[in-house]
Each structure stands twice: as structure tokens, then as C-alpha cells.
Amino acid sequence: MPALRPLLPLLLLLRLTSGAGLLPGLGSHPGVCPNQLSPNLWVDAQSTCERECSRDQDCAAAEKCCINVCGLHSCVAARFPGSPAAPTTAASCEGFVCPQQGSDCDIWDGQPVCRCRDRCEKEPSFTCASDGLTYYNRCYMDAEACLRGLHLHIVPCKHVLSWPPSSPGPPETTARPTPGAAPVPPALYSSPSPQAVQVGGTASLHCDVSGRPPPAVTWEKQSHQRENLIMRPDQMYGNVVVTSIGQLVLYNARPEDAGLYTCTARNAAGLLRADFPLSVVQREPARDAAPSIPAPAECLPDVQACTGPTSPHLVLWHYDPQRGGCMTFPARGCDGAARGFETYEACQQACARGPGDACVLPAVQGPCRGWEPRWAYSPLLQQCHPFVYGGCEGNGNNFHSRESCEDACPVPRTPPCRACRLRSKLALSLCRSDFAIVGRLTEVLEEPEAAGGIARVALEDVLKDDKMGLKFLGTKYLEVTLSGMDWACPCPNMTAGDGPLVIMGEVRDGVAVLDAGSYVRAASEKRVKKILELLEKQACELLNRFQD
């Protein structure tokens, strides 16, 4: 028995060591990280590097502090050996409502959650928002609202100009503009230049922009799909990272990473978009070889279908007539003969004849500091805007005056639409109208040949109805005829916003009718309350007595 005493500490140590894998360490939470059970169990926080932590105590009781793809640690739901990786019943977003503007339901770890939208349509539909910024389209505004936890709504656009339309001031006003001066639209410090990187290499695209206030920068890769992925600063997207200064870094380049990467910079004064071409080649591109003149068919993508094996990872450049420049297309070739160019530069030199249109280039400030006010054309906004030019390394989209810019570039000559004018204010409009409703616009059908159209409205409240019996019939939807509409500048503007509207109009032959002077305004609580007070006090009857 005495001989066993020296062995007791050793046996106790072995016992504790054998159970170390099942019991949590000192201060740690029970369970293991998801990727310790299966490499496929990378969850959201581990792939986007959110919710950073240094130990389990920084996380909730049911979470572990696990390593993420950025080399740091994030809080994620703990897993246990033998537990199912996913719930037995399939989760669903049906009936799950996301109250935050710009968020959509998604399934995460077997539960429905709300995520901010990260893909938007690539078609422009410029939207001025209540935060003073101009967005590429409505989807971009909603995504930004979700990211910042705000509610943004559409407002009428107001174009801010930094200088008067006249020529620049005296020579002594070349000092750097003071912070208290008027807002300045975004401008690049240098023109985007095409880059070529070998497979497995690293590429860096820097959207270095100036502007006042400092512009917000996002990136997206142009594709042939309906929507593009919006890439924001301080985020990782696969092998792409966008840094806090608006620099896009692509690691371990693959052939399918080739394409046009578009930088969007915006502030309260304007919007700028610039394309950065990136080619991914199998070998070091030859610099001395002169490009051969291709056949016209070689510049265009191969549209014929081949029955043989395809090359999904072979991406070539072709000329896109609609865009006026080269873009990437998936390589299609019969018997291995793929048609196209390996780099953007080779495609442009061979297929883009002539110097090109300077008006489609982004505004470039340049690295010098001889500050001068200049004008540049924005193909997105279809108008000329002022910017600060440094004095060197600019491009052709650089004009001394607004007049010379508008003479050189396709500025629409039609005057802007004026604000819709009501025939009378709220009280008088209410008394002169046959109906007053609160509803949401569901559809607008234009009939330009008849100078009219039809608006379908989902009713929320009937405030006044003298001739249609909407409440008695329990009508939920009302079809309103739009009379005398100029669809170039529609009044009343029945397409503005998607919130509830106060709509007042006439009834002709049993049909609700709106004309250019009809009352259509946003249904604010104050406005609806005012209408109810007027109806309760029988203000219209008193007004008719005075008129008689």
C-alpha cells in the first residue's frame, strides 16, 4: 500500500487530462466552435469578422469565442459533439417581419433573422434621400438605411453648385478651399488605370477621391446578372477586402476575378462612379508585342452554343457596343478555340477605335495643388457640375466653364419639371372635392396618347365621400382616372414615394377623377387630423353659406 502512494498524484493527473476535452476550461463556456465539428460549419460571424472577442467571457453564455477568417476571434453559437448541425424541422421566413428599412429575412443557424440587403439592381434610378445624399437607386438608399439603423425617405432633388455659373474668380483665389465653404462633389485624385495580375497574385484598386464632405465609397463588380453585390469598407467578401480608406484588395487572384470593378463615391454635393479594369492572366503579359488588328467578329462575344466541354474558369474580354468599352464574358469556344482577349488593354487597343468620348470619364482632380474651379460632365446625372482641379494629370472631362461643358457633352435641353401647384390649399380643396381618401398607390398605368392614365389605390381610410358610397360598399381598392396628365412632368405626381397619400378629387359619371390641380399630398398625422377637424366642425357648410 505505501508503494502505491507515489502513483496517486500521477493517476489523478491522468484522470483530469482524459476529461479535459469534455469539460470547459477555467472561465470558458461549454461546447466547441462550429468548425471544430466540421469545416463546413462556418457561420456568419466567422466569415464576416463581426462581433469581435478575445475570450469566451466576452460572449453570451451559449456562445464561444472562435477564430474567424480575418485571423481574429468572433462570438458564435457553441456546438456540442453529437448534437444535430441543423434543426430537424426546416426553418421558414413565412410570417417573419423585418421592421428595419432595407432588411430581408434570412435563415441563420436554423432561425429566421433579419439581414441588411447587400445586392442591388445595377440599373440607375437616382434617388435623393432625407439624409442629403444622392443614391444610385432606391435599393442603395434602403441598404444604407439598414446599415446605419435609420429610416430614410425620398425627397425632391436639390443640385448644389460650388461656384456660380460664371468664369472662375481672380488668380489670388487659388488657396485650398476652407472647410466652411460650400459642398464639393467627389473627384478622383488620379485616373483609373487598367491592371493585369497573374493567377494567384494580389491586386490593389484604390478609389482615392476628394470632396466636401468626405465622400462615402462602395465597390461592386460589374456582371451580366440583374443585381450586383455592394462591397463596403471594413468588410471581407471571399478573397476580396475593402479597407477603411476605400481600397479594394484582391488576394489569390483567379481567372473568374477578372472584370470591371466600379467605385461609387457620394456626398451631399454629388455622385461619382469610376470603372477600374482588372485582368487575370496565366503568365506575365508581354509588353513589347504590338496588338494585331482583329476581325470584327473577334471583338464580340461568341454567342453560338457548343456541345463540347466548356471552360467555366476561362474569362476573356470582348467589346460591348452598348457600354462603349470592353467587358468580360464567359469564354465559349468549340474544340477549345475560345474567341476574345486575355487583357482589357489588348481589347481596348484592338476594338475601341478612336480616342473615345471624354464626357464618359470621371472627374479627376489630380495630385497637384494649383487649385482651380473647373466643370465636368456626369453621365449618370446627365448634367455638368463643378469640381476642384489640381492643375495636372487630369483628363478630357475638364472644362473651364459650364457653357463649354454643356456645348461638348449631351446635356438635356428640356427645362426641369416645376413643382406641382395645387389649385387651392387644404381646406378649400376639401370643400371643392367630391371625395377625400387616405391610401397607398399600388399601380399607375400611363396612357400618353389619351393624355391620361389610371392609378390604383389601396384604401386605408375614407374621409369624405359624397357620390361613390365607398364605406357602404366596403371598397378596399379604388381606381382613379388621371385626366390631362403630361407624363414628362406629371401633376399630380402619383409616383413619388410609397407611403400613404391624402387624395382629393372629383367624381364624374360615378368615376373618381384627378386632374393637374387636384390635391395629392403625403398623409401625415397632422394633415389627416386637420381634415377630420374641418369635417367635424362642418367648415364646408359654413364656407358655402358665405359664398351664397
UniProtKB/Swiss-Prot annotation:
**Marked site: Reactive bond:** K122, E123
Q: In which tissues is it expressed?
A: Expressed in pancreas, kidney, liver, placenta, and lung.
List all membrane-crossing ranges.
none
Q: Name one GO biological process term.
A: skeletal system development
Fetch the SMART domains from UniProt: IG (SM00409), IGc2 (SM00408), KU (SM00131), WAP (SM00217)
Q: Which residue intervals define the domain WAP in the entry?
A: 26-79
Q: Which residues form the signal peptide?
A: 1-19
Show the GO cellular component annotation of the record.
extracellular space
Which PROSITE patterns does the protein's record reference?
BPTI_KUNITZ_1, BPTI_KUNITZ_2, IG_LIKE, KAZAL_2, NTR, WAP
Residue ranges of every copy of the Kazal-like domain listed in the record: 108-159
Single GO molecular function: serine-type endopeptidase inhibitor activity
Start and end residues of each NTR domain = 409-540
| Xref: InterPro entries | Elafin-like_sf, Ig-like_dom, Ig-like_dom_sf, Ig-like_fold, Ig_sub, Ig_sub2, Kazal_dom, Kazal_dom_sf
| UniProt-annotated stretches for the region Disordered | 164-184
User: Which cysteines bridge via disulfide bonds?
Assistant: C33-C66, C49-C70, C53-C65, C59-C75, C116-C146, C120-C139, C128-C157, C207-C263, C299-C351, C306-C334, C326-C347, C359-C409, C368-C392, C384-C405, C417-C489, C420-C491, C431-C540
Domain annotation BPTI/Kunitz inhibitor: ranges: 299-351, 359-409
Provide the residues annotated with a glycan attachment (glycosylation): N493
Keywords of the record: Disulfide bond, Glycoprotein, Immunoglobulin domain, Metalloenzyme inhibitor, Metalloprotease inhibitor, Protease inhibitor, Repeat, Secreted, Serine protease inhibitor, Signal
Location(s), subcellular: Secreted
Which ranges carry the Ig-like C2-type domain?
A: 186-279
User: In the UniProt entry, what is the domain comment?
Assistant: The second BPTI/Kunitz inhibitor domain is able to inhibit trypsin. It has however no activity toward chymotrypsin, elastase, plasmin, pancreatic kallikrein, lung tryptase, plasma kallikrein, thrombin, urokinase or tissue plasminogen activator.
What's its job?
A: Protease-inhibitor that contains multiple distinct protease inhibitor domains. Probably has serine protease- and metalloprotease-inhibitor activity.
What the record says about family reads: Belongs to the WFIKKN family.
Q: Kindly provide the name given to this protein in its UniProt entry.
A: WAP, Kazal, immunoglobulin, Kunitz and NTR domain-containing protein 1
Give the classification, highest ranks.
Answer: Eukaryota, Metazoa, Chordata, Craniata, Vertebrata
